Amino acid sequence: MKIYQDIYPISKPSQIFAILPFYSGDVDDGFRFGGLGRWYGRLVALIILIGSLTLGEDVLFASKEYRLVASAQGDTEEINRTIETLLCIISYTMVVLSSVQNASRHFRTLHDIAKIDEYLLANGFRETYSCRNLTILVTSAAGGVLAVAFYYIHYRSGIGAKRQIILLLIYFLQLLYSTLLALYLRTLMMNLAQRIGFLNQKLDTFNLQDCGHMENWRELSNLIEVLCKFRYITENINCVAGVSLLFYFGFSFYTVTNQSYLAFATLTAGSLSSKTEVADTIGLSCIWVLAETITMIVICSACDGLASEVNGTAQILARIYGKSKQFQNLIDKFLTKSIKQDLQFTAYGFFSIDNSTLFKIFSAVTTYLVILIQFKQLEDSKVEDISQA
């Protein structure tokens, strides 16, 4: 049951907000996913869904009431802000709904890891993973966004008190769920990477041993069986988190693009904005981009690290393959699947998530930003033509 202890610090807040299913029991007697855990998750999902529909309707049909700087915003900026706010709502709602929908599969995956931990502990595995520093960094960035947004919405905008609360609530829920999702996945994936890395180290020792002994054959057989189970577990984690990752990365991509564009639009607003408004707008945009970038880095690096460990197993087995003919049939069963298709984490199959994902995202952001700037310039030129006429 070591896995439950390893993820305990992040598991409690994740359970409260229905990202991780509530399970009952203890380390000695085992854990169970009962009816109370199921209904709690469904209740949270229902509350979030109803709240999101209500908030989304107000944002969609009263978008002008949510304009942060009315004097500095044209039609393009207003539309972009509205879309961003709606994506905020959709993103955290889908994270909750997807997590609750996959709760049973999620728990079974954790239970499978716990069973394998018994074998690992018997073979000397004692490693633990802590992301305390990352937790401080990610939560500080999220808190910074919320603090700047509060200052800007409350003190600098003309938004009414009721809609100030609505907008801040939307931002809070999005930041909360994106932070919890990133930290939970990071903790779980890096713990898995440690376990697979430990097995890979044991597997690598077969290059230095006499492969003719029957005892070595049994040990290799056990290792390959456990590694096959870990590959299956890793694929299950991707299935459980795939929808959440898709909607989160979709929101992050749009937010990074939109906030970069809004910073540009504010800088080029000229006499329409005061210097104070320019500084505040850029500050809000920069903190948004920074927070989303940090969160994406946390997720991408975790996915890449775990996938690298899983795919590294096939490379080690390939080196052992030629040492003894009696090992070849055993190794073939693993290599046949692993060599044909390396493990990749994906956002529900739409795109892969690894260390190169951020580069691809920012390349796309740059292209999209150029298009938005051209639309802005076209809009400004039309306004000038009308004023001159």
Curated annotation (Swiss-Prot):
Single GO biological process annotation from the record: signal transduction
Record topology, Cytoplasmic segments: 1-42, 104-133, 186-236, 303-352
Disruption phenotype: Mutant males display robust courtship behavior in the presence of CH503-perfumed females.
Extracellular compartment residues: 64-82, 155-164, 258-281, 374-389
GO cellular component terms, A-Z: axon; dendrite; membrane; neuronal cell body; plasma membrane
Any Pfam family matching the protein: 7tm_7
Entry function: Dsx-dependent essential component of pheromone-driven courtship behavior. Recognizes a female pheromone involved in the second step (tapping step) of the courtship display which is essential for efficient execution of the entire courtship sequence and timely mating. Required for detection of the male sex pheromone CH503 which is transferred from males to females during mating and inhibits courtship behavior by other males.
Protein name: Gustatory receptor 68a
Gene this chain is encoded by: Gr68a
